[in-house]
């Protein structure tokens, strides 16, 4: 007789009532959205012009998008019709991860303002409000039932390992990981209700459109602070979508409609140069396509002539030249 040892549990990190935790998470996310419409600094010396009321700019846009995602995931926990599609795994881990990403982006922005402009005095009240409500959202999300590793399943604690990994990860990440203990989802991902083919194709097209926009937004960032904030938001956002099971659901649709997926990928690649503000990436792409075509042609010609070894050399040589261009 074999014993099954559970390595995961669904428990909150902070012992507060689930209803109160979810309500606070929703409220915190909504307030974070509102805070992006306030000025975070009084001077436009910081890139992105975060001085305007009623119009988010620069890094505020990243906080806004992350906060909206947090609001959607937290609200989906109430069983709102239509929102269940975005969290088929029914896991609160996605809510916590995107809330953590919102917090990290917001605090990175405000700290960058203070460091670059010479102190917290350069922050407007809106900046302090954003810091407070994003922190509230993360704390509230820790009160939701999270899928966590059991204490028994963690690596055995040892002070040398703890100190070493804490130093490597910046003295914060590893201790927090051991404290929060986020684990995998023990439940099966719910299968979506069958949709008409045209609706599934629209979802695939929309997914490729969003992916193209996110990619082009990242490579077109105009300053380092925005790029770092972009990396933070995308990393936590993708992790949240993965834990929610949404990436798996989209993957299932693309597998079902392979031809449509291939067409969508080609259309996205064709549209990519038209999304650029300069010709740099378009020229690189054109050069790669030219040499890829030459390599394919050489391979076909020498292959028909029976000179297969020469074909391999030609293909690799042209590929190496194209890679050097990149």
What spans do the regions from the language model cover?
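Cytoplasmic-side transmembrane-helix entry/capping segments in multi-pass membrane proteins
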Residues: 89-99, 251-262, 284-290, 310-318
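Single transmembrane alpha-helix segments in multi-pass membrane proteins
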Residues: 70-71, 278-326
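Short, solvent-exposed interaction modules
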Residues: 91-114
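Canonical alpha-helical transmembrane segments
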Residues: 66-84, 236-245, 303
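Alpha-helical membrane-associated segments of multi-pass integral membrane proteins
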Residues: 121-140, 309
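Short, intrinsically disordered terminal tails adjacent to the first/last structured region
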Residues: 1-11, 18, 25, 93-97
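Membrane-interfacial amphipathic/re-entrant helices at transmembrane-helix boundaries
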Residues: 11-24, 28-66, 107-130, 151-291
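Hydrophobic core segments of alpha-helical transmembrane domains
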Residues: 67-78, 131-145
């Amino acid at each position: 007789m074999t014993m099954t040892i559970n390595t995961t549990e669904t428990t909150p990190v902070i012992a507060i009532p689930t209803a109160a935790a979810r309500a606070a998470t929703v409220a915190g996310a909504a307030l974070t959205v509102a805070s992006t419409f306030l000025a975070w600094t009084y001077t436009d010396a910081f890139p992105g012009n975060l001085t305007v009321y009623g119009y988010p700019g620069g890094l505020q846009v990243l906080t806004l998008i992350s906060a909206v995602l947090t609001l959607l995931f937290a609200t989906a926990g109430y069983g709102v019709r239509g929102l269940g599609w975005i969290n088929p795994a029914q896991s609160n881990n996605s809510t916590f991860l995107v809330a953590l990403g919102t917090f990290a982006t917001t605090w990175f922005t405000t700290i960058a303002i203070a460091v670059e402009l010479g102190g917290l005095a350069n922050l407007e009240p809106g900046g302090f409000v954003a810091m407070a409500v994003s922190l509230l959202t993360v704390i509230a999300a820790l009160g939701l039932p999270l899928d966590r590793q059991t204490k028994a399943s963690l690596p055995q604690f040892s002070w040398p390992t703890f100190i070493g990994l804490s130093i490597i990860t910046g003295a914060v990440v590893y201790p927090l990981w051991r404290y929060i203990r986020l684990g995998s989802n023990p439940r099966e991902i719910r299968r979506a209700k069958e949709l008409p083919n045209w609706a599934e194709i629209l979802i695939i097209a929309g997914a490729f459109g969003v992916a193209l926009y996110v990619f082009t937004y990242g490579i077109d960032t105009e300053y380092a602070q925005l790029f770092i904030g972009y990396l933070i938001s995308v990393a936590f956002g993708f992790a949240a979508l993965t834990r929610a099971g949404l990436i798996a659901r989209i993957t299932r649709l693309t597998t079902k409609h392979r031809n449509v997926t291939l067409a969508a990928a080609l259309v996205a690649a064709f549209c990519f140069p038209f999304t650029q503000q300069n010709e740099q990436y378009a020229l690189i792409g054109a050069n790669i396509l030219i040499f890829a075509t030459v390599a394919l042609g050489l391979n076909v010609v020498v292959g028909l002539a029976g000179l297969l070894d020469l074909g391999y050399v030609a293909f690799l040589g042209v590929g190496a030249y194209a890679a050097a261009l990149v």
